[in-house]
Structure formats: C-alpha cells, structure tokens
Amino acid sequence: MSYYGSSYHIINADAKYPGYPPEHIIAEKRRARRRLLHKDGSCNVYFKHIFGEWGSYVVDIFTTLVDTKWRHMFVIFSLSYILSWLIFGSVFWLIAFHHGDLLNDPDITPCVDNVHSFTGAFLFSLETQTTIGYGYRCVTEECSVAVLMVILQSILSCIINTFIIGAALAKMATARKRAQTIRFSYFALIGMRDGKLCLMWRIGDFRPNHVVEGTVRAQLLRYTEDSEGRMTMAFKDLKLVNDQIILVTPVTIVHEIDHESPLYALDRKAVAKDNFEILVTFIYTGDSTGTSHQSRSSYVPREILWGHRFNDVLEVKRKYYKVNCLQFEGSVEVYAPFCSAKQLDWKDQQLHIEKAPPVRESCTSDTKARRRSFSAVAIVSSCENPEETTTSATHEYRETPYQKALLTLNRISVESQM
C-alpha cells in the first residue's frame, strides 16, 4: 500500500446501527465531558438569576409567546380567555348586586336584563366577548357603568385575539420542525482526501421540498483552565471547502486540516484525549415558505473517527438519481496515517529535500582557475569596448580570450626584442 493509498476494508458494524463502527474501536472509556450543544441542536445552557427576568419577558410579550412551547401556548391561550370572562363576569355581578338586580324586584329596572346570579353574569360576559349574542341577556340604559364595561370588554377582546391568535400563527409560520428534517451524521470522520488530511461530516435533507440554498459554518470550541481553576471557552472558525451548498442530495462537508486549522498539530491520540467541541450550523431557506431556518449539531472527540470515509449514497440511474438513505450514516475504514497534519507536511518537505539534485560547483571552480591564470586575459578583456553587446548564438565565430591573450603576448615579446 502506498503512503496515500486508497485500499480499505469494511468494518464490522453493529446490527442496531448499520454503518456505525463497533464500540471497541471508538476510544477507551473515559469521563463524558459536558457539551455546549446536544446532538439535536438544543443548547445545554441554563441561566440562573437573570436581571429583570420577568420584566423583560412581559415587555416583549409577543416574542415570548412565539418562543414558548406549544403546551405552554395552549395554557396561556385558554387562561387569557377564561380569566377575562371571569373578571368581567365578576364586575357585572358586582354592578347587579350594587344596583339591587339580584332581588328580582319588578319595580327596579336592571342594569343587565336576566342577570340574577353570578352564573348569569358570567354567561353575559362570555356572550359579550365572543359576540355570540343570544338575545336573552342584554345591557340597558339604566347604568352607565355597565355600558362602559361592555365597551372595555369589547376592546380588550380584540387585543387578546390579536396577540394570542397572531402569536399562534407566527409560531406555526416559523416551522421549527423543519429543522428536524435536516439531519447531521452522528459521527465526524478524519481521513485522507486528495492527499490531505481532512475532517468530514455529512448533511442531508429528507423532505420532498428541498432547501433553496444554505450556508454551513463550523467552529471549534476549546475549554481551558487558567492557573486559578477558572474555565474559559475559546472559539475558532474552521475553514470549509464547500460552505455554500444546495441540499438536493446529502452533501459531505470537508475541512482541510492545514496550517491555519486548530487541528493541525493533533494526531490520532491527541484528538481522542483532547477537550474540544466542534459546533456546526446550517442556515438555509426553504422553497415552500421562503423563510430562513437554522439547524445545529456538535461533535466531541469521542464522536470523531480517525481513518474512515462515508459510504456512497448517490446512485446514478438511467433517468434519475437515487439516494440510498440507509447509507447516510454508513462509513468504511480506510488507510490514514496516525500522525498529525503538521507531521505529514514536515515529512513531505523532508522527502522533497532528499529528492532535490545537488548543486553543481563547476562554475565556481572554473572561476577560481581563471583567477589563478595569467593576467593577460584581463588585459585583453580590458581592451574590449564595454559598449558592445554580448555575442549571441547567431553571431559569427570569434576567437576565444585565450587565443587573443596568446597573440598579445607574442606581440609584446616581438616589440621587446626590437
């Protein structure tokens, strides 16, 4: 097998989780670390003693109703109507009691006809707010306070309907369940890809109406402790090869572990023993509603498999593409060095240095030999015109400097004899 070989064999998968590696190859058992994000995307954060907690929720009541859970929403929805009916029913009963309508005296014109008990007052409040209008109970001109209460209850009923029904519709329009159909692979993988060590995970959309476009982002969260024992969290972005995707079919997100990556100096053992968490988010727009959504997940060291790659899920048919969802979580074990990406780059540099040809020193030795030769060469070269350009391969043959030097020496010897 070559250094970057592609041979692999399928690992023995558990029957409960097809494609998952067996338990004995993941990592040794160790204490589970608290994670910031759960696998379903929910935050593992609890706020205690928030300054102005209830006041901030009441001021922004609409956002509070939209963000609350559906069971709490139904309780608030029911209590808002029931309490308003009870409050105004009590007011109408007090008006009737103060005016003497409960005595059933025919000489007294009641404030509200046919209200002789608290039950009757409650039913009148219910009919007024829901605009049922049975016609049996009605307010008269005898009491202006009763007329004013009917006006206030009508206005309050419109406000309650606006907030409660509007919040329910807004909560339905958010379609948070849409984020649950965007699925992240349970494991993240580290393996060789195009000759480079890469971190990979998979994202898939399993609804018929796919997302229009989406942006993937990943951050590495590292927990550190200072000398005083206080824990700090440091975030660092992971550069992705394909961060802008159209999720028609499952896509494998790739992060190349280069010199800018926080995983650059970590080998297989260091990754298994390190204390970090990789937070991944996917922000996308649905084609049915056109609203923006966000799906989240995270990976801790025990969920990162070294030396694996994902199985192929896409099959090319004659007229269409087939996605095998059973292979979404499947992975196979492939060859990958256990050293870090930093060590791989260092080995590659050493390999290139060893294969580089040695530097030739013929020119240097030739220059030294010429310097030791007779200085007549310098005499000839100094006599040449410095403005002349250097000779090219197309010029005619000229005498070498040594021949010129020999002629010059002969001329000097002849002149000396004369």
From Swiss-Prot:
Pfam families: IRK, IRK_C. Changing residue 250 to L: In HKTD; when coexpressed with KCNJ10 in Xenopus oocytes, it results in decreased channel expression at the surface and reduced potassium current amplitude compared to the wild-type. The gene is KCNJ16. It is linked to Hypokalemic tubulopathy and deafness: An autosomal recessive disease characterized by renal tubulopathy with hypokalemia, salt wasting, disturbed acid-base homeostasis, and sensorineural deafness. The record marks 161 as: Role in the control of polyamine-mediated channel gating and in the blocking by intracellular magnesium. Gene3D superfamilies: 1.10.287.70, G protein-activated inward rectifier potassium channel 1 (2.60.40.1400). GO terms for biological process: potassium ion import across plasma membrane; potassium ion transmembrane transport; potassium ion transport; regulation of monoatomic ion transmembrane transport. Keywords: Cell membrane, Deafness, Disease variant, Ion channel, Ion transport, Membrane, Phosphoprotein, Potassium, Potassium transport, Transmembrane, Transmembrane helix, Transport, Voltage-gated channel. Residues 1-67, 172-418 are cytoplasmic. The lineage of its organism: Eukaryota, Metazoa, Chordata, Craniata, Vertebrata. It forms heteromeric channels with Kir4.1/KCNJ10; this interaction is required for KCNJ16 localization to the basolateral membrane in kidney cells. As a heteromer with KCNJ10, may interact with MAGI1; this interaction may facilitate KCNJ10/KCNJ16 potassium channel expression at the basolateral membrane in kidney cells. May form heteromers with Kir2.1/KCNJ2. Can form heteromeric channels with Kir4.2/KCNJ15. It catalyses: K(+)(in) = K(+)(out). Channel activity is strongly regulated by variations of cytosolic pH; channels are activated by alkaline and inhibited by acidic pH values. Activated by phosphatidylinositol 4,5 biphosphate (PtdIns(4,5)P2). Changing residue 137 to C: In HKTD; when coexpressed with KCNJ10 or KCNJ15 in Xenopus oocytes, it results in decreased channel expression at the surface and reduced potassium current amplitude compared to the wild-type. This is Inward rectifier potassium channel 16. Residues 118-134 dip into the membrane without crossing it.
